[in-house]
Amino acid sequence: MLALFFSLAPLLSQALPLGYTAAPAESFYFWPENISSLQAGEIFRKRELLTLPDIFDFGPNLEKVVQVAYKTRLTDGNDSFSIASIFIPKNPSPELKLYSYQTFEDAVQLDCAPSYALEVGNKSSNYLPVTSNLSAISRELEKGRHCIIPDHEGYISGFFAGRQEGYAGLDGIRAARNYLNGTNETPIGIFGYSGGAQATAWIVDLHDEYAPDLNFVGTVSGGTLVDAWGTFQYIDYPKVYLKGSILIMYTGLFSGYPAQFEVIWPYIEPVIQENMLLLRLAPNDCNQSPILQGYNNSIMAGIHVDLPEFPASKYIFQHESLLANYSVVPVSTPKFPRYMYHGGSDELAKLSLVEQYVDQQWNTGANLTFVVYPGLLHDETAYRGFDAAMDWLDAQLDSGYLPPVNSTHT
């Protein structure tokens, strides 16, 4: 059974890359034969979307959408690839400026990827989550900026595998910049909330080491998950009603570490194993509503190891933390301006973990604005904080600098 799980992603990427969905452009997602000879972010395939679903109304501001397939890497260093969707403005600004939006895919199937949802619309069951906040794209197109939505989970659909998302996101931005004939000086702003914020946070963390050629002038993340084990402690047992979402997080996270996952697998209860496979195999089922019906325990209770101490899982958690006191990999403090916002009563992303991360970043010289919306839950904060965050990012792209405000309240 485990062999089937691990073989699924490469199998789909070469033969049935979109969870068996019969899409006219299936071959666009096939594995390239020459990937080992490509550079990170190098484009090996591209296409123009001839139509967009009816929900997208970009008015007179959108010229076209181009999708590019590019090389990236997995957490273990092996070659990988992903897709980036590039929105070309009708009236581009004189200076090329890029805006990258990491949407919340929050799924572990390839046919849940943003690029596919943009192509097929509601034929993808992840269509609405992926496209729920494209007003930001419209806003930037109106300003003449080129916009990017990378498939930051990559072809392994590694939701919650932060390092995997960071590499795929950085290479997607790099691929878009190269497609648009940008340079190392091209100004770039990035934005993500919730699952997209986690990807954004890892893009930020890995930037200096992996992609210092990208000129980030401002980054925004809201409702950010900064520590995998701390997140599971916060939501797994006390919020058993979220068990489907939690299992998706375990499945995506462990998929980013196949060697360690293989060690953990025999200790996972059969019902959870079966549902992990179902998450991967059920065609075009991104919402996962039937997952774990009748199972009323926490997921961690169904994994019969001491997760924070068992060597394989401990390795994963210590590599999937942005907290300097827990991560075994140095956490970076980039010098470009950043903005983070969070709900004071966020039920998914624990505020105290984010505050700990922010304090550590401030103590090491970060240029970081942090805003907390007292009493607001996760989804409420997404909408309440959006305009202020985008205003900040627009100012960064306009002027290239805003002084930090080390604020912990609105």
UniProtKB/Swiss-Prot annotation:
Keyword terms of this UniProt record: Glycoprotein, Hydrolase, Lipid biosynthesis, Lipid metabolism, Secreted, Signal
One GO term of the biological process aspect: lipid catabolic process
pH influence on activity: Optimum pH is 3.5-6. Stable from pH 3.5 to pH 8.
Top-level EC class: hydrolase
Top-level taxon of the source organism: Eukaryota
Signal sequence interval, chain numbering: 1-15
Organism: Starmerella bombicola
Function: Responsible for the lactonization of acidic sophorolipids (SLs). Catalyzes the intramolecular esterification (ring closure) between the carboxyl group of the hydroxy fatty acid and the hydroxyl group of sophorose C6'' of acidic SLs. Lactonizes acetylated acidic SLs, producing di-acetylated C18:2, C18:1 and C18:0 lactonic SL, and mono-acetylated C18:1 lactonic SL. Does not catalyze the reverse reaction, the hydrolysis of lactonic SL into acidic SL, nor hydrolysis of triglycerides or paranitrophenyl esters.
Name recorded for this polypeptide: Lactone esterase
This protein's GO CC annotations: extracellular region
GO molecular function: triacylglycerol lipase activity
Reported temperature dependence: Optimum temperature is 20-50 degrees Celsius.
Glycosylation sites: N34, N78, N122, N133, N181, N296, N325, N367, N406
Similarity comment text for this entry: Belongs to the AB hydrolase superfamily. Lipase family.
Biotechnology: Sophorolipids (SLs) are a family of fungal biosurfactants that have been commercialized as biodegradable detergents in ecological cleaning solutions. They naturally exist in two forms, a closed lactone and an open acidic form. Each form has distinct properties, acidic SLs have better foaming properties, while lactonic SLs are better in surface tension reduction and have antimicrobial activity.
Family matches, as PANTHER family: LIPASE 5, PTHR34853
Lineage of the species this protein comes from: Eukaryota, Fungi, Dikarya, Ascomycota, Saccharomycotina
Posttranslational modification: Glycosylated.
Catalytic residues in the record: S194 (charge relay system), D346 (charge relay system), H378 (charge relay system)
Keyword Lipid biosynthesis: yes
EC number: 3.1.1.-
